[in-house]
Structure formats: C-alpha cells, structure tokens
Regions:
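Positively charged, polyanion-binding regions of nucleic-acid-associated proteins
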Residues: 1-23
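Alpha-helix C-caps/helix-loop-beta hinges
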Residues: 17, 70-71
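A short acidic, leucine-rich amphipathic alpha-helix
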Residues: 24-28, 67
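Short, positively charged loop/turn segments that connect secondary-structure elements
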Residues: 31-58
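Short aromatic/hydrophobic-glycine micro-motifs
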Residues: 34, 72-73
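Short amphipathic alpha-helical interaction segments
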Residues: 52-69, 75-78
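Short, amphipathic alpha-helical interaction segments positioned at domain boundaries
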Residues: 82-90
Length: 90
C-alpha cells in the first residue's frame, strides 16, 4: 500500500473509532505489512522537547504529520492507562 492509501485507511480508521492511539496505528501498520520502524520521532511543532512518539522511520512520521497539517486528523492527549491496557507495559 502506498502512502496515500495508508493515509486514507488511517483517516477512515480514526474516524470510525473516534480516535486511536499510536499503539493502534502501529498495529495497523503491522497488519498491512508497512515497515514503520526507524530512528525518527513526531514532536510538537511549537516545542521540539515535547515528543509525541518515536522510533518510526521518516515515511511513517510523514504520513501522520501530513494528516495533521492537512487537518484530516488532530492529536489530542490520551490517558496513559490506554497505553498500559493496549501494551501491557507500565
């Protein structure tokens, strides 16, 4: 699946579920066989010290950043318990 197809599928998933976590996005990437792992991160455009997610490659970060810039999705803080529930990690 190309970047545009990934973006369309992500927007649909996010709208259908009324929001998703980065863990759920990674699970989606795994399901479609998209190689997202790397050394890049998504951080706040206003404060580079605020990191939203890391260990993705440039293409994966670009997909999310483009969706946010195009105002197709928005990033909002999630309850940390969601990540514990989804990953089983504390």
């Amino acid at each position: 699946m190309n970047s545009e197809g990934i973006k369309l599928s992500l927007v649909k998933m996010i709208k259908d579920k009324r929001g998703v976590s980065f863990v759920e996005i990674e699970n989606f990437f795994d399901e479609i066989g998209f190689d997202y792992l790397g050394d890049e991160m998504i951080n706040s455009g206003e404060n580079k010290k605020i990191i939203y997610w890391c260990d993705w490659n440039e293409q994966a970060c670009g997909v999310i950043i483009e969706l946010v810039k195009d105002e197709l999705v928005e990033m909002t803080p999630a309850n940390p318990l969601i990540y514990i529930w989804l990953t089983g990690k504390v």
